[in-house]
């Protein structure tokens, strides 16, 4: 109950919140692409990825993270068919032993049975995997998002991210034994 009806109401803040709530995921992605890549490149990417993301992806991934995924997908080529990002989710604290790995691939999916032994041999326990098929019409990409535990406690991600990604890539490309 409000005493004497003296509560201050910020009408501009309420309007701003309503406008933000009414914006679609695609609208937010378009804005994030323009902010990250500039208007011309943002428009090109918006047109390419406009209908590409499946519903599960748009429900699971915020538009700002989708921009990072698009950047990884755009870096793929015939010579560079695998991209990756080893990271800790924002909702996990630095002292968490949970880590994630996103694999990005062109044309065909990566099979769980190919990746699981590699991750386990690198000392991680896979507790979940979510695949996303990104269909841009003229080309198809795959994103596999792995959720994992490091059984010996938290990883110092800043120190281990680059080494992990290099080791995984070398194993994937048969330059190191699994």
Residues covered by each model-derived region:
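Non-catalytic interaction/regulatory segments
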Residues: 1-178
